[in-house]
Amino acid sequence: AAMRERRSGETPRGIPINWYYTFNQLPDDSEQPCLVVAQEFLDVFPVHQFVYKDGLWLEKLVDIDHTAESPLHFRMVLSQAPTPASITLMGNAKGHQFREGDGVEVSPVALATCEEIAGKVCKSGGAALLVDYGANATSSDSLRGFKDHETTNILSLPGLVDTTADVDFDACGRVAARRGAKVVGAIPQ
């Protein structure tokens, strides 16, 4: 909360610093470099999970579990038909070789954010360092929940469990490169 209240300041040597909460708040100033440092930022954006079944991409969805045995009262199910998200996000993946049951996770918000960061950085001659969970590949089922620093089922205690998913740094790098950014790539910690 204290960080939200403080919107500007300066270093001990008098260099001004400004904090912003969205990238569109950043000034379009090509005379000053834009430096972005983000830790565990991209992994919190929503993900869509898809499973390849009978030649179609079906989406994993949350459903109500009416069984008496279920302590969570929610369950993950596959859509019965392609969803608008599976058509939009996976429609161009039909030419690839996928096997029955293959899964893919996609975060359109993380990709759009990387594209926006790249645009700002390229325009200003700055740089970005994004430190996060992930790999140089697409995950299929990395969505997980955390509560009190422990891994927990994402469907338990809705609204009280933090969710996270691995970042696809390869996909993020591709969208950044399309905006003109020089991408170094994911480096293991």
Spans of features found by a protein language model:
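Class I S-adenosyl-L-methionine
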Residues: 21-189
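S-adenosyl-L-methionine
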Residues: 2-32
